[in-house]
A protein has these predicted regions:
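Short acidic, glycine/proline-enriched helix-loop-strand junctions
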Residues: 91-125
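Solvent-exposed loop/turn and edge beta-strand elements of beta-rich ligand-binding domains
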Residues: 130-132
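Structural motif
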Residues: 1-3, 86-89
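Generic recognition of flexible, low-complexity loop/linker segments
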Residues: 16, 70-75, 109-111, 216-218, ...
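Structural recognition of the beta-strand scaffold that forms the well-ordered cores
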Residues: 27-29, 83-86
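Short, polar loop motifs at secondary-structure junctions
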Residues: 87-91, 244-247
Length: 319
């Protein structure tokens, strides 16, 4: 959705995050309540900059491109975002001129605190499938680094007297995201041995190695809060799943998932039926076990103290 400061008339300019609540989960919000916890956030704010004449540009140290409806819609297609909500006359006019958008409905006008009229207009984005086969094999960057400062950002320059807090340069994932020519060859932080490798300093010169069969069909896509499943016509071709990568995702019927640019997942189906499930990591299981042991130990110590106090009370009561 288009960002504008006038949304504060609802109490906060982030009010559209409640779209899932008001639409009975029919529509989601790309910008969520816990967006600080996701490495997909920087890419969202780049989209917001392209799709909002007056964006918030909330994440620092990003090369914001400015309002560009065509570039913004290409990014929504890349990220599998199906709808775009425009409010300002400038954004609505640009959206109506974009051939990849279909106007669905509008409501309003509403008055902003500045006395301006606003219509909310919803557009459907074409070619925004949530799961797609990839044309070329992902290229694994070496040395492997999953940290946001090696993926989204580059190394921060040394501070100087003139620049005590210099901005971070963009990392390989951001550079890739802003160059549509490279989108057919995702960058990866890890992957099978047959995927090509390249030094991360040369990421933008990554080779294009064709995938085994990029024309496979994907069907029966189903998504819940904790699982994603789909069917492929032929196993073996890497498939891009346009959902934020996190180590808790586990694949059944496929190898992976592997983290790829911008911050999505690729799996390599070994069967026709593929399921991704969001479970617990080893660190979480360890933390859970330690928590249970801590509770048990606390109860045991408490009971021991109670028995000691009871024994002392009995001794003091003996004539």
């Amino acid at each position: 959705w288009e960002y504008e400061s006038g949304l504060s008339r609802f109490g906060t300019p982030m009010a559209p995050m409640l779209l899932p609540y008001f639409t009975d989960q029919c529509l989601g919000s790309m910008e969520g309540l816990y967006f600080e916890a996701s490495s997909t956030t920087p890419f969202h704010f780049i989209n917001q900059s392209e799709l909002s004449p007056n964006p918030s540009s909330a994440q620092r140290d990003l090369p914001y491109p400015g309002f560009d409806m065509d570039a913004g819609i290409r990014h929504l297609q890349l990220m599998g975002v199906k709808y775009y909500l425009a409010a300002s006359p400038q954004a609505i006019e640009a959206a109506r001129a974009n051939p990849d958008l279909t106007e669905l409905a509008s409501t309003g006008p509403f008055s902003t605190p500045a006395g301006e009229d606003r219509d909310w207009t919803v557009f459907e984005v074409a070619d925004a499938d949530p799961v797609v086969p990839i044309e070329n094999l992902p290229v694994v960057l070496t040395p492997e680094d999953d940290h946001i400062d090696g993926w989204v950002y580059g190394e921060r320059p040394e501070a100087t007297e003139e620049a005590p807090n210099p901005p971070k340069p963009s990392g390989p994932a951001i550079d890739w995201y802003l160059d549509p020519v490279r989108w057919d060859t995702p960058l990866a932080t890890s992957g099978p041995d047959e995927w090509p490798r390249i030094d991360r300093e040369s990421a933008m010169q990554a080779p294009s190695v064709p995938a085994p069969d990029p024309d496979i069909e994907i069907s029966d896509y189903t998504e819940t809060n904790e699982s994603i499943s789909f069917t492929v016509s032929e196993p073996g071709t890497p498939v891009l799943v346009k959902t934020s990568y996190f180590p808790n995702w586990q694949a059944s019927g496929a190898e992976g998932p592997y983290r790829v640019s911008p911050n999505f997942m690729v799996v390599v189906p070994t069967e026709n039926e593929v399921t991704l499930t969001y479970g617990r990591s080893m660190v979480e299981w360890l933390g859970l076990v330690m928590t249970i042991l801590g509770i048990v130990l606390t109860v045991m110590l408490g009971r021991g103290d109670q028995r000691r106090m009871d024994a002392e009370a009995a001794l003091s009561a003996t004539p």
